[in-house]
């Protein structure tokens, strides 16, 4: 029976510790999760690795926005792959597209070669590619380990039909593992377990904490005006624990039915 994987996306040491406490199997480490995540600093990776005994895959994304990268941006990505390989990351989470929405095979091959023995996840660039079936096939040719996807929808429940189709293709030898992401909650995992054969799930399990600042200067945003500078997003260990419980229960039920 395939092993279930619960991956938690985190952007701080505190969130990494909460994910580990809740029973996550693996971390995806990034910075600025509130904007979808960008590449984390090496110091953050080192602290997380020192504090948490979990495999860490590092999201590499040089900026917010699309996945069509300039040569300068690509060189940054390539250097980051090398840096995190040398630092001991279990894997990297990457994705490059061309202007027509196809997987940029030349760039992907270079990044994967730089990754060496690290595992490679194709991130949600997959969700904005033009042809997901062809992209999945190409990802298999590249030797990509996992694809994180919502099924090309805002949330994975909406993308379940495509996720089911991809999961069927996954059974072919050597094809990437499908990891459902976007809008993942314990209840969503339960629905997927009941209706699909997907065994990998990605969630952030965010809660919002109020800042400890006593003095507050309102109406001075540091980034997007809609963002509240005094709200801190953090992983909720209890949500991670509930998600893990759902997976363990489903695994036990599956074993009993075999």
In which residue ranges do the predicted regions lie?
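Glycine-enriched alpha-helix->loop->beta-strand junction motifs that scaffold or abut catalytic
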Residues: 21-27, 52-55, 88-91, 114-118, ...
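Alpha-helix-loop-beta-strand connector modules within alpha/beta enzyme cores
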Residues: 37-64, 103-125, 160-185, 225-253
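A short acidic, helix-capping loop that chelates divalent metal ions and anchors anionic groups
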Residues: 63-69, 212
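Catalytic cores of alpha/beta
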Residues: 11-21, 68-80, 127-142, 166, ...
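N-terminal amphipathic alpha-helix/helix-capping segment at the start of soluble metabolic enzymes
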Residues: 1-9, 49-50, 217-220, 255-257
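Hydrophobic faces of well-ordered beta-strands that scaffold small-molecule active sites
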Residues: 4-8, 27-29, 56-60, 92-94, ...
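Glycine-rich phosphate-binding active-site loops on the catalytic face of alpha/beta enzymes
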Residues: 26-38, 83-99, 144-157, 196-217
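Active-site-adjacent beta->alpha loops and helix N-cap segments on the catalytic face
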Residues: 14, 33-54, 72-75, 96-116, ...
């Amino acid at each position: 029976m395939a092993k279930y994987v619960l991956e938690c996306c985190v952007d701080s040491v505190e969130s990494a510790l909460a994910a580990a406490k809740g029973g996550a199997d693996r971390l995806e480490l990034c910075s600025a999760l509130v904007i979808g995540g960008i590449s984390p600093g090496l110091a953050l990776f080192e602290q997380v690795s020192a504090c948490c005994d979990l495999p860490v895959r590092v999201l590499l994304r040089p900026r917010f926005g699309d996945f069509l990268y300039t040569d300068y941006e690509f060189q940054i990505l390539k250097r980051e792959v090398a840096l995190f390989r040398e630092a001991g990351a279990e894997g990297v989470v990457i994705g490059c597209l061309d202007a027509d929405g196809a997987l940029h095979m030349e760039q992907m091959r270079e990044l994967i070669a730089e990754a060496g023995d690290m595992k490679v996840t194709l991130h949600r660039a997959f969700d904005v590619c033009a042809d997901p079936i062809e992209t999945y096939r190409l990802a298999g040719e590249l030797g990509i380990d996992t694809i994180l996807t919502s099924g090309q929808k805002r949330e994975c429940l909406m993308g379940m039909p495509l996720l089911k189709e991809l999961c069927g293709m996954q059974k072919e030898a050597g094809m990437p593992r499908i990891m459902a992401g976007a809008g993942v909650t314990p209840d969503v995992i339960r629905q997927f377990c009941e209706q699909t054969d997907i065994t990998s799930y990605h969630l952030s399990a965010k809660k919002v904490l109020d800042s400890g600042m006593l003095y507050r200067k309102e109406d001075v945003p540091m980034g997007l005006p809609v963002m509240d500078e005094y709200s801190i997003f953090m992983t909720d260990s209890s949500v991670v624990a509930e998600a893990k419980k759902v997976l363990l229960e489903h695994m036990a039920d599956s074993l009993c039915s075999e």
